[in-house]
Amino acid sequence: MKISKIIIYDEPTVPEIQINRIEKFLKDTFHTDVEVRRSFFENVNDEIFQKVASTRIFELKKPFSKHIPTELEIQIERKNTDNSQNEEKVLYDGFELQKTISKFIPTDEQNQNVLHIILTNKLTCTFDESDFRYHARALIGTNPSIISTTGIIEAPAKPKEYYLELMTDFSKEKTDEINKKYKGEFLEYNDPRLSEVLEGYILQAIMYYETGEAFCENKECRLYNAHWQKELLYSQLKNKKFCSKHEESFRKIINQS
Ligand SMILES: [Zn+2]
């Protein structure tokens, strides 16, 4: 394995993350050194908050252009409160955020054998040249890897019928009724299943860093790039296995030292 140590940064505003279970999962799976830290955004140079705020995006149909943040926006970053459930979500360019974070990793920890995995509530998005718009993303791979808990909830789509029913009536009452009807079929905020699903994304981050291969096209694989919540819950909670091809590359990785 190229990686000799994984440093994973928790997101303290998301209490569903069972960081100790995740740590154990990583140690048991990869038999490598794992260190858990409370948050990437604690004990870091104050400059970072201005830089992070400048990666905000406001227009979904335009490629990234650097935002000049207001004092209030910088203050919001400093506080790192969970705003993911607000109506007005703050969106960030995932690759720009990744670049920013990488600059704040101490030099002695910038080592290709040390993989940094940052869990965050920030909603990361990437601009897609094929349809010329931003899409929410749960995982921004490479080193550091960013995994967005809000992205896990927002990026894979809910059932089509859910949106159709909502289209007719947006009232709070109707929304609650529909949420009840489809309960369990997709991840919600404060969903206790989030932590286990996170393990799958962490696996994807590690495998991507080790092999350079992004995602899998096979729905029976934990590396599957789920477009629908239903697929996500199937591949990460029910099936929980690699396809035969990735089972083999996983074995190879853990047997190299
Ligand atoms: Zn696969």
List each language-model region with its residue ranges.
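N-terminal low-structure segments adjacent to metalloprotease catalytic domains
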Residues: 1-137, 250-257
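Metalloprotease/metallohydrolase-associated module, dominated by Zn2+-dependent proteases
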Residues: 6-13, 135-193, 210-257
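Catalytic glutamate of the conserved HExxH
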Residues: 197-209
